[in-house]
Amino acid sequence: MDANKLIIGGRYIYQMLDGKEVEVSHTGNDGDGRYVFHTRRRMYRFVFGPDTVRDRVRAYE
């Protein structure tokens, strides 16, 4: 998915390195060209660059 198409508050699926898929919400940008996501219960915070977003994040269906 293109990073410029992300919507704050939108739900997405992140595919981890081991193949497991995790539902995450986009919570904004950190001002450094990186994108911040949280899991549904906000237990984990992920910060991705645009390459990771393009390769491993897709829209929630």
What are these regions (language model features)?
Residues M1-I7:
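Mixed-charge, Lys/Arg-rich low-complexity intrinsically disordered regions
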Residues L17:
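Short polar catalytic/cofactor-binding loops
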